[in-house]
């Protein structure tokens, strides 16, 4: 391992000890905000520190085995050779592990997120497919024991959704789901198709991190246009009696957010503000990313909603993930929420891409 990397790891080990000492300081314990921030930092350092301590121990074991190998006793020499082999193998494994742990982390990976699904080309069939995608994500969320809360729906005339927005809450949800952003295409025979012809339609998926209030960008109230209207769709008689639905328009960017799934106007407004903040932040982040990444390739794509990332071919039972040339003949399982077969290879490819970029620097 490079000396510069060793020095960086030694610095992290030192910082870990500092943070641990601070967490037992009465002055820090009484300051909830600082205690929370240090606890988060300690948690983030834990994996890399544990791996580096194992790396240091394996390095010591290798040196001890080398010393033993210089002994005249043939039995000791043989034992030393075996120990050297084991230590070298462990060091290689730990070096790979540490390289990945040292990769720059997306600060939003641990955040909750919003999933927005919109029907695109394909009319009624696109709306039905948007409903299928929403069900797929709901099943995946359930399998992870996360929480899903529907924030806004615009139902299709023959089923599914023209648009659906949901919030997913849980540990590391944005980091798991962020690669779902982009164009999703379906190829299948619609139920209304009498000739048995395969139709192609599409949906866009946008995954945005929820921005904590303490980190949220400040939105000038003068830049907001607020409209109230009566909620449509399910909800009983109540929806016809009060203007509980909210539409927020951010005038400088033109971003519009509607929320109507809560019965109270106050709750709908709070949720709409959360989504609006996330969208504005995403625009700012994309500007920054474009500037930073203009010189390097990103294998898993930019998450641009216009980029076609995946095709679901029902006649062949096939899912094709175009960004990493992955083809699975497990369409039914994927549509039932078994997404790890796609998400895990995407995350590994992203790590490989980042490692390649670091080695070029």
From Swiss-Prot:
NCBIfam families: prfA, PRK00591.1. It comes from the Bacteria. Belongs to the prokaryotic/mitochondrial release factor family. Its main location: cytoplasm. Residues 285-305 are annotated as: Disordered. This is Peptide chain release factor 1. One of its GO terms (cellular component) is cytoplasm. Methylated by PrmC. Methylation increases the termination efficiency of RF1. Transmembrane segments: none annotated.
């Amino acid at each position: 391992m490079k000396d510069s990397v060793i020095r960086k790891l030694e610095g992290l080990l030192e910082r870990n000890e500092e943070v641990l000492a601070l967490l037992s300081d009465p002055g820090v314990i009484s300051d909830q905000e600082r205690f929370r921030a240090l606890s988060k930092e300690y948690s983030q350092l834990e994996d890399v520190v544990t791996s580096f301590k194992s790396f240091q121990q394996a390095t010591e074991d290798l040196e001890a085995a080398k010393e033993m190998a210089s002994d005249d006793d043939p039995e000791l020499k043989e034992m030393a050779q075996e120990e050297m082999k084991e230590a070298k193998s462990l060091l290689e494994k730990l070096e790979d592990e540490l390289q990945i742990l040292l990769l720059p982390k997306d600060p939003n990976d641990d955040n909750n997120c919003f999933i927005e699904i919109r029907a695109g080309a394909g009319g009624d069939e696109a709306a039905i497919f948007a409903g299928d995608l929403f069900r797929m994500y709901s099943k995946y969320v359930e399998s992870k024991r996360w929480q899903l809360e529907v924030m806004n729906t615009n139902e299709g005339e023959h089923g599914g959704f023209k648009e659906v927005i949901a919030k997913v809450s849980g540990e590391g949800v944005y980091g798991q789901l962020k690669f779902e952003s982009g164009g999703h295409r379906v190829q299948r025979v619609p139920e209304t198709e009498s000739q048995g012809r395969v139709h192609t339609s599409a949906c866009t998926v946008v995954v945005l991190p929820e921005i904590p209030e303490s980190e949220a960008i400040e939105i000038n109230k003068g830049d907001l246009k607020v409209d109230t209207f009566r909620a449509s769709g399910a909800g009983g008689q109540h929806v016809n009696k009060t203007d509980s639905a909210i539409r927020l328009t951010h005038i400088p960017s033109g971003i519009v957010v509607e929320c109507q799934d809560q019965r109270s106007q106050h709750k709908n407004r709070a949720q709409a503000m959360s989504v609006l903040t996330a969208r504005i932040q995403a625009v700012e982040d994309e500007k920054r990313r474009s500037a930073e990444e203009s010189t390097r390739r990103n294998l898993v794509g930019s998450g641009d909603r216009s980029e076609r990332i995946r095709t679901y071919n029902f006649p062949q039972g096939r899912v094709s993930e175009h960004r990493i040339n992955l083809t699975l003949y497990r369409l039914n399982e994927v549509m039932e929420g078994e997404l790890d077969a796609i998400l895990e290879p995407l995350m590994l490819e992203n790590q490989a891409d980042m490692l390649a970029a670091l080695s070029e620097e």
